[in-house]
Amino acid sequence: MVFENIIVEKKDRIAWITLNRPQVLNALSQELMTELRGAMEEIGGDDSVRVVVIRGAGRCFGAGGDLKQAREMVSDLRGARALLENWHRTLFAVERCPKIVIAAVHGFALAGSLELVMACDLAIATEDARIGDQHMNYGLASAGSASQRMPRLIGIRKAKELLLSGDWVSGKEAERIGLVNKAVLADRFDEEVSEFAAKFASKAPAPARLIKELVNWGMQADLNTAITLELLAATGGGTMGATTEGMAAFVEKKKPEF
């Protein structure tokens, strides 16, 4: 697949996807979202990759959807549905990718760009980043998953506060409330992101994939069903190689090699 709106690079078990529309603050056009979905699907089948990092070129992670394009598309219901279906397919491709997906946020991640961040497994941001869903400020209700993913991440009351007010929070505050995993100094951002990604890339891929799937499945099931799924998955044999290596390393007091 040829990419015009994103850049894909692979190195040391990590795939780096850069949203590359800096001239419009990485606004998420239909073309960019289609390319991102294609990249996630391709990377999902690449055994050399264990971690994906999604970041933005230029001043920010992203200012949200491409409103100029969206305004043209939503003039009728068919266009609006096509836009949102493409959007949701892409976010599900990110969320369901068998790799660990990390959002690296600098500058700001607003509205649709925040929805992309929330579809990732993990997120790291600069302390001074501005992060928020601003649909309410323009008389809009979220239609890109914020109303569903945000409360699952930070709880119902805080999610309602941010969604209904249209306020943004700093990266540091986003870390405190659980919207991102880690907030770091801006002048160490690149190094911190690389170290964060490398930590997860060093882990065994089969159990990592299984844990991701179990957590995602479990969020949609009652506790008893979710624990049963965990039991069945853990005894299915798919992670046996990593389990054997890990146990041997523990007994022999050495570092496991995955």
Q: What kind of region is each of these model predictions?
A:
Residues 219, 255-258:
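Short C-terminal tail/terminal secondary-structure segment
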